[in-house]
Amino acid sequence: MFSHCEGYRIEGGVTDGETNWNNNFNQNNNNNDNNKVMASIYKQQFYGKPHKTFMSLSSPNGPILVCIKKVGNSSDDFYLLVCTEKGFEEVRANKDSLQKSKTTRSFLKMRPTSLNVITSVRPELTKVPLCKVTDKSIQEELVKVCEPEFNKVIKSALLYCKESQRDDNDMLKNISSNVSQEYNDFLNFLGEKVELKDFSKFNGGLDIKNNSHGTHSIYSQINDVEVMYHVATMLPFFPSDPKQSERRKLISLDRVVIIFNDGSKPMSPNCIKSKSTQIIILIQPIKNFVGNSKTTIGISNDENRVVGEQPSPSLTTTTTTTTTTSPTINSNSPTPSNKIKYRVSISNRDEVPNYGPPLPDPPIFEKDDSFRNFLYQKMVGGAASLRNTPAFTSKNSEKASALINVISKYSTKGMEQI
């Protein structure tokens, strides 16, 4: 459960002495007239600011447009917005994590070019004829078009919270060798454990070439919606970094966050210190319903990729004396168990419009397909509610053609061949 916090709207009840919670989803208010308009990602991050734009009509994913800029005063961090017919995706890249190219620039240890960065995070574009757009009027077109299309792909952070933990500073320090069986069972239930190396489906901005984001993650698909989870306990862990900056960089970009809470005390909706986070889905196992689990899950060594570094003793309760393989999380969703139940509470920033489906009363679910489908639908509904009034209309053909029209228009003018 969430505690009351100014600036947030809670679904599933608050813990300020209420014995019954009130579902404040109002179907009649779930329309565009009452939705507060939120600035698009492009307008927030790129419009009117120093950046570069590249495009191509012929990539493996069809027409593609990429906006890229340096982050702050550093020349080592880059922020990208990748736009295709399928949707819009934010990607953050660091110079040290980029694929090393055998060029004069790399030998001289010069900073990578924008094209180096793009082809490193999107290797499939290496042989694509990307052109740089020099006509600044494209910004006016893109500010109307570049609004995330959430109904096809979603990336969501997934954090594990222990009994004594209260915010992301604590949760980002958790490692997979020191989590509960209930948490591992939930990962098993939520989706498929996939190897990131050369992963061909939606990767959610995770590194699929150099394992800089770990070796595995959790992926799921329902109908035509793909979901990639940024699972904090599966990301590399650096004992020398108390803030776990690399984990934070990735997760801080996610608008939708799932927290699996093993604790019994209420959590504050502002437990995630990121302006990007708009929706938090808090899932708490009801342990009275948990039977003896027969699922066997090993210990992941994803977070121990850095040679010579081991988890801090303060973060572990057991000592592993033998080398173990990655968790045996089933590659396919297991047969649901009715012995486990979950209580769900959802925190939304006040500016997030209402969205469905509403939580049931009481907000308790059995571990079954209905609960899994509810989570997917809630993430899709929440992510879609974050959109500004988009240039994309409700028809799928018009959604795709909006971006194609911009790329086609500027492919004949204001272009600089790379």
From Swiss-Prot:
Q: Which GO terms describe its molecular function?
A: enzyme regulator activity; GTPase activator activity
The cross-references to PROSITE patterns, in alphabetical order and at most eight, read: RAPGAP
Which cysteines bridge via disulfide bonds? none
Q: Which domain of life is it from?
A: Eukaryota
| Residue span(s) of domain Rap-GAP | 142-407
Q: Give the span(s) annotated as Disordered.
A: 304-339
Low complexity biased stretches: 311-338
Q: Which UniProt keywords apply?
A: GTPase activation
Q: Which GO terms describe its cellular component?
A: cell cortex; cell leading edge; cytoplasm
Q: Which GO terms describe its biological process?
A: actin filament organization; cell-substrate adhesion; regulation of cell-cell adhesion; regulation of myosin II filament assembly; regulation of small GTPase mediated signal transduction; small GTPase-mediated signal transduction; sorocarp stalk cell differentiation; sorocarp stalk development
Give the phenotype of cells or organisms lacking this gene. Answer: Null cells have increased levels of active rap1, increased substrate adhesion, abnormal F-actin distribution, show defects in cell-cell and substrate adhesion during aggregation and vegetative growth.
Instruction: Output the Pfam families linked to this UniProt entry.
Output: Rap_GAP
Asked if DNA damage is a keyword of the record, the answer is no
What does the function comment of this entry state?
Mediates the deactivation of rap1 during multicellular development and is required for normal morphogenesis. Also required for the correct patterning of specific subtypes of prestalk cells.
- The protein, known as: RapA guanosine triphosphatase-activating protein B
Source species of the chain: Dictyostelium discoideum
Gene name of the encoded protein: rapgapB
